[in-house]
Amino acid sequence: MRVLMFGWEFPPHIAGGLGTACYGMTRGLARNDVDVTFVVPHAYGDEDQRFTHVLNASDVEALYGSTGSGADDILEKMSFIHIDSNMVPYISPEEYEQYQERYVKSGQKVWSTTDAWKQRYTFSGKYGANLMEEVARYAVVAVQVAKNLEGQFDVIHAHDWLTYYAGIAAKRVSGKPLVVHMHATEYDRSGENVNTQVYAIERAGMHAADRVIAVSNLTRNIVINRYGVPADKVVTVHNAVRFAAGQCKMPERGVDDKIVTFLGRITYQKGPDYFVEAAAKVLKKVPNVRFVMAGSGDMMNHVIRRVARLGIADRFHFTGFLRGEDVHKMFQLSDVYVMPSVSEPFGISPLEAMRSNVPVIISKQSGVAEVLDYAVKVDYWDVDALADAIYGLIQYPALAGMFVSKGLEEVTNLKWNDAAAKIKTVYEAVIKENKKQ
């Protein structure tokens, strides 16, 4: 079986759990005799390609404009005006006419999608101000990729909203079935204040797909209830964790204090403010504890100011974003790992912490809570319960030891090979259905 897979990041160049999940998944699929071509906007050349072929979208020469391809209506929805500003190039037809008239009068060139020309796009593969433009151009390249690989894949698999338009376009031009993977919804990222553009892309992708894979039942329910996707079309496949050699080397600790770690994006979804409030409560009882916030995000300055106001800055450490070996080192230095997410579709980090013999505290509002018994679970908003859980794990070694030993047994059974086998059955089902049409 051959899969054309569209992603936005791939290790070692990642911004979060999405790339890590994609890597584990492709390894698992390879062991289930599935051949994966993994397309990314920007490949660096140092990606591990032992289990998958990584295709760099920036190397693909695509036909842009009125091509009769599967991406034309996507381009119509996402028109681009090249001006020196931070404006996100995702506007309505009416707004486009207004901007076009204004810039034509000014004598500046406005590109129109009614003309076709060949072009090779240079993608950043990041999450910058021109993200929507890159999403649309990725769909244009996806058409060309599908044409170039005609007859070389049986199914298309697209990860998260960034690649959904690419998946739709590839499906239209190839006629192959489409599976979209929902790793995190816009409701997870933004609460009720959703970005309507992102929501529209998510909804379009899931309704165009033959199957939707959700990373948890929590996410599955959101997909069904918030996006109107038929329940029989949505399948839950939980994520897993990869065990690699050489993860047992203990770095020098340097301090005798207990270390409690938060590792993730410092943004609303991850609940960093609840971690800070709980830390302040713990420090009133046990002063010899250090709290580490490993990550970056839009709430960083807010969190730093709150730590200062609470008078606990001398007990707090901000490492910035960590990746690869630094993540493993951070876990090995930790006595407790905390994931207080407001809404977490799954959450691979607790599995990585448990793999490193660290007891974990997770929010009940997380997908990973569905597969873990030996993790302390609290409501994200219950700061008192979170503080009590941290206190218990650092003050009672026998309790922490039980969670470590039982947790390691539990997480050892969460294998990517098993998750990939479930994904393969989804592929087989949509391929069979597609042949009947």
What are these regions (language model features)?
Residues 302-322:
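Nucleotide-activated donor-binding/catalytic signature segment of Leloir-type glycosyltransferases, i.e.
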Residues 321-322, 329-334:
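Short alpha-helical donor nucleotide-sugar binding micro-motif in glycosyltransferases
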Residues 342:
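Aromatic "clamp/platform" in nucleotide-sugar-dependent glycosyltransferases that forms part
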